[in-house]
C-alpha cells in the first residue's frame, strides 16, 4: 500500500509514476475523499470546541443562578452532531483505505517503461541451448511416453490444469524440492519454514493478492480463508503486525509448499503440460530487510534462484520486467526464463521482486533502526527458488534422448537413489 502522506504531498509525481504502469486518474477519488475527510475533521473539531467551551459556560451560569437549559440543549445537539460526523468519517476513511488497497506499487526508477512484456529488457544469459540431432519433444509428450506424467487421469480426478506424477516422475519432483531446499539453506543462508497452506484474508491483503485479485484465488466456502497461491503469503505474513529488531535483519526465509491458483485470466493459455496449473509445487524465497539494503538483496536473491538452474545445467536468461508487465506489489522484478526445447523458447521459471515497503505497510511490519529512532517499515522481497513442475518439464525437455529416455542431472542422482536415466517402459 502506498503511503497516503506521500500521495498528498507529491500527488502529481505519484500520478506520473502510476501512468508508467498504464493507470490514469486513479488518484482523483482518493484526493476527493481525503478533502472530504479533512472537512469532516474540521467540523468535528469545531463541534468539540463548542461543546467544551459551552460546558464551562454552563458551570458558570449555574453558579450565577442562571438557567442554562437552552445552552445545554445546544451541547446535546453538538454531541449528536459529533457522533454523526464520526460515523461519516469512518465511512470516508474506509473508502480511502479501499482505494489505497487497489493502487499498485510505484515502479523503481531503473524499471523500463512499457505497456507489456514486449518492453522487458534482457539482462544476461547463462548456458547454451542444446543442439539436438533429432526433433526434440515437448514435456507433455515425453512424460506420458515414460509413464511418469498422467494428464488424462488427473483430468478424471480434478478436471483441467492438474497433473498426476507417477513412479520416477513423482520421485523426480521430490528430488528437485529437496535439492532446492538443501542449496538455499546450506549454501545461501535461508531458514526453512513449513507454513500452513491456508491463510486468513488479512494475510492475502498484506501481500497484495486481495482485494484486487480475489477471482484468481481459491476461497474456502463459508470461511474467511484462502488456499495459498504462493508461499510468499505465509512467509511474509509470519511477521504481520510485529515490530522487529534491526539487529535481527535481514531475514532469509524459504519454504516448499503446494500453490493453488484459479488462473481466472488465463483461459486458453498453456492448456497443455505443467506450465500453468491450478495446483503446483514451488520453493519460495522471501527476505525482510532494512530499506537501504533492499536492492542489493534483490540482486542476491536473483542470483540464488539462478544458482540452482546452473547446478542443474539448464540454460536460462534473466529479464527485467517493464512497468506494464510487473506484478501489483512489485517495485522491480527480474524474471528468470529457462530454455524449453519443446517450445523453442525461454519460459518463465522464477520471478524475483523487491516490493520495498508496499507489503510491509499493508501488513504493518516495522522495525526500529536504533533505540531512539522512529519506527520504520521493513522492505520485503520474494522470488521463486524455483517452480518445481516447470523445473521437471525443463529437465525432461533439455535432457531427453533420441530413444525417448531422459538423463537425470548429476546433482539430482543422490536424491533419486543413484538413478541415472528414466527409460521408457518395456512394451
Swiss-Prot record:
Subunit note: Homodimer. The tRNA molecule binds across the dimer.
Enzyme class: ligase
Note on domains (UniProt): Consists of two distinct domains, a catalytic core and a N-terminal extension that is involved in tRNA binding.
Name of the gene this protein is made from: serS
Protein family per UniProt: Belongs to the class-II aminoacyl-tRNA synthetase family. Type-1 seryl-tRNA synthetase subfamily.
Native source organism of the sequence: Syntrophomonas wolfei subsp. wolfei (strain DSM 2245B / Goettingen)
EC number: 6.1.1.11
Keyword terms of this UniProt record: Aminoacyl-tRNA synthetase, ATP-binding, Cytoplasm, Ligase, Nucleotide-binding, Protein biosynthesis
Positions of ATP binding: 261-263, 348-351
Keyword Cytoplasm: yes
Function: Catalyzes the attachment of serine to tRNA(Ser). Is also able to aminoacylate tRNA(Sec) with serine, to form the misacylated tRNA L-seryl-tRNA(Sec), which will be further converted into selenocysteinyl-tRNA(Sec).
Domain of life where this protein originates: Bacteria
GO annotation (BP), single: seryl-tRNA aminoacylation
NCBIfam families: serS
PANTHER family, alphabetized: SERINE--TRNA LIGASE, SERYL-TRNA SYNTHETASE
Name of this protein: Serine--tRNA ligase
Pathway: Aminoacyl-tRNA biosynthesis; selenocysteinyl-tRNA(Sec) biosynthesis; L-seryl-tRNA(Sec) from L-serine and tRNA(Sec): step 1/1
Binding of L-serine, residues: 230-232, 284, 384
Cell compartment(s), UniProt: Cytoplasm
PROSITE patterns in UniProt: AA_TRNA_LIGASE_II
Catalytic activity: tRNA(Ser) + L-serine + ATP = L-seryl-tRNA(Ser) + AMP + diphosphate + H(+); tRNA(Sec) + L-serine + ATP = L-seryl-tRNA(Sec) + AMP + diphosphate + H(+)
